[in-house]
Amino acid sequence: MEAKYITLTKENIEKEHICCAFSDKKCKDSYELKKTWLKNEFENGYVFRRLDERAKVFIEYGPAEKAWVPVNAPNYLMINCFWVSGKYKGCGHGKALLQSAVEDAKAQGRDGLVTVVGTSKFHFMGDAKWLLRQGFETIEKLPYGFSLLALKINSAAPDPSFNGTVSSGECEEKEGVVVYLSLIHISEPTRPISIS
């Protein structure tokens, strides 16, 4: 029997689970907030695709230009979360989900896929070794344990990069107090607010 994957939309998200927290009742409020956030992000081209089972087998990605990650990757899709767990590992689900993201990138005329991973394995991030075996390349490594990987569709496209503030540890604003604010109803990446 062939695996069935579904893509969540504003129309079906209320009746579908989002994989992240269905096994932990303590996360109910966060779970509902994430669903609200997803509904807003779907309008920005965000995709949440999962196995049509009660399982943690899914991929989330969207336009890198709108990603909440300190990366410069114009015309790429940013993989934010990619998870295949438990008995579903080794069954081809990861490859199928990744291939669906590649197909979306090609259909949109994107230059490729990009993601941030732990240089050493972090339990909350994509598996760098697996992604490298799938054709991703390490574009940049940070000294404190994170790497930027890319899978180029357009080999002539410029490499993505971490924002300069990631390496320097300093924000661009130097006067007053800088506050980074994130609200669930905001559909644009968090922007600094400078208060003098």
Which functions belong to the PLM regions below?
Residues A105-S120:
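Conserved GNAT acetyl-CoA-binding A-motif
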Residues P143-V166:
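C-terminal "cap" of GNAT-fold acetyltransferases
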